[in-house]
Curated annotation (Swiss-Prot):
Transmembrane segments: none annotated. This is Gamma-glutamyl phosphate reductase. It holds the Pfam family Aldedh. Catalyzes the NADPH-dependent reduction of L-glutamate 5-phosphate into L-glutamate 5-semialdehyde and phosphate. The product spontaneously undergoes cyclization to form 1-pyrroline-5-carboxylate. Belongs to the gamma-glutamyl phosphate reductase family. One of its GO terms (molecular function) is NADP binding. GO terms for cellular component: cytoplasm. Pathway: Amino-acid biosynthesis; L-proline biosynthesis; L-glutamate 5-semialdehyde from L-glutamate: step 2/2.
């Protein structure tokens, strides 16, 4: 526990200092971090290249390597994201409500930092910076534990941030990286109840399940996206095709990409050939289909029950033909990861029923699921997309990283 004890003690101390830091000071520091990331671009890209080369040596898929890779454009986007967070309103100190009670006590409920956030995540180095910027803006210290495949990139990014904070006389331990990527140390972080106020895992199903099983600290579950699109009998089929192509092929390695397709039986014979032709013009996609869909599609593999429950993160999609809207809703609620789901329909009642009855953080009508994102939702950068109902749900922006505290002022009142 020596590693985690040291990180935890540092983070706890830093969190008390951060909680007292004013909005202007936080924003100034964030803007300087954004500048430093661009100034240190050669160093960061050199370290990232080491991770990419090692990943390629180990035969990691091109899609997963893409998640890992940084270039000048992506680093500019990361720095821009930090500036965007600096421009957002500061939720800390906001009054949720205030009133005077029956005995004259003035009671104010305000937003305050959570304290120490721990984050365990995979592959994407940008998460290090996004998570730091959101935690810092909300007065929280953060302990980051990335994957082995991104250790050089994460180390470089965190080093740049820490040096920048120190140059401003701020506690560099506002952000710390767990450099030991072993499962044993990760398990210690999951059990650090004396230091960690909340743990946020961000990655694939295996990581999420491991954290849920082994964590002793509070957890906000994020990330896994077994996302469906249902093409209703009253859908505009051209619109539906365009949406499915986008949701599946634009960036298949992300959690808001479509993984399952449900099609009403009345439009399946018209829609599936249209979709197959359109999608293959963009990128070949493997269809894993039920018996009825296999008879319509030119190239489809039989789907297993496991396929219907899988987040592929690849150019693969499961396909099922359903008899009714109700069957589609039941199917989705059986297999969903509670992330994002979409219906394509011109029937207003069907759309409303779908949105009311489907159990997911984001439920769309006539739009791609690729929009489930903190920036798109106007929240700024996100620390993750919560697929649970407590303490936050959906894209987690600044407000999700706060708690509340009651401030009570009296004039000598006692309870009788």
């Amino acid at each position: 526990m020596a590693i985690i004890d040291n990180l935890g003690q540092n983070a706890k101390k830093a969190s008390f200092l951060l909680a007292q830091l004013g909005t202007e000071a936080k924003n100034t520091a964030l803007l300087k971090v954004a500048e430093a990331l661009l100034a240190e671009l050669p160093y960061i890209l050199e370290e990232n290249a080491k991770d990419v080369a090692l990943a390629q040596e180990h035969g990691i898929s091109a899609i997963m390597v893409d998640r890992l890779r940084l270039d000048e454009k992506r680093l500019q986007d990361i720095a821009s994201g930090v500036r965007d967070v600096a421009a957002l309103g500061d939720p800390i100190g906001q009054v949720v409500r205030g009133y005077t009670n029956m005995v004259g006590l003035k009671i104010i409920q305000k937003r305050v930092p959570l304290g120490v956030i721990a984050m365990i995540f995979e592959s994407r180095p940008n998460v290090s910076v996004d998570a730091f910027s959101l935690a810092f803006k909300t007065g929280n210290a953060i302990i980051l534990r990335g994957g082995r495949d991104a250790i050089c990139s994460n180390t470089a990014l965190v080093n740049v941030i820490r040096r920048t904070l120190a140059s401003f006389g701020l506690d560099e331990n506002a952000v710390q990286l767990v450099e030991d990527t072993s499962h044993e140390v990760a398990k210690e972080l999951m059990a650090a109840v004396d230091y960690v106020d909340v743990l946020i895992p961000r990655g694939g199903a295996r990581l999420i399940q491991t954290v849920k099983k082994e964590a002793k600290v509070p957890v906000i579950e994020t990330g896994v996206g077994n996302v469906h699109i249902y093409v209703d009998e009253f859908a505009d089929l051209d619109m539906a095709s365009k949406i499915v192509v986008n949701a599946k092929t634009q960036r298949p390695s992300v959690c808001n990409a479509a993984e399952g397709l449900l099609v009403h039986e009345k439009v399946a014979s018209d829609f599936l050939p249209k979709l197959e032709a359109a999608i293959n013009q963009i990128h070949p996609v493997e269809f894993r289909a039920d018996d009825r869909a296999q008879k319509i599609l030119k190239n489809a593999q039989p789907a297993s029950q496991e396929d219907y429950a899988t987040e592929f993160l690849d150019y693969i999609i499961s396909v099922k033909i359903v008899n009714s809207l109700g069957e589609a809703i039941d199917w989705i609620n059986t297999y969903t990861s509670h992330h994002s789901e979409s219906i394509i329909t011109r029937d207003i009642q069907a759309a409303e029923r779908f949105q009311d009855e489907v159990d997911a953080a984001a439920v769309y009508v006539n739009a791609s699921t690729r929009f489930t994102d903190g920036f798109v939702f106007g929240l700024g950068a996100e620390i993750g997309i919560s697929t649970q109902k407590l303490h936050a749900r959906g894209p987690m922006g600044l407000e999700a990283l706060t708690s509340t505290k009651f401030y009570i002022n009296g004039k000598g009142q006692i309870r009788e």
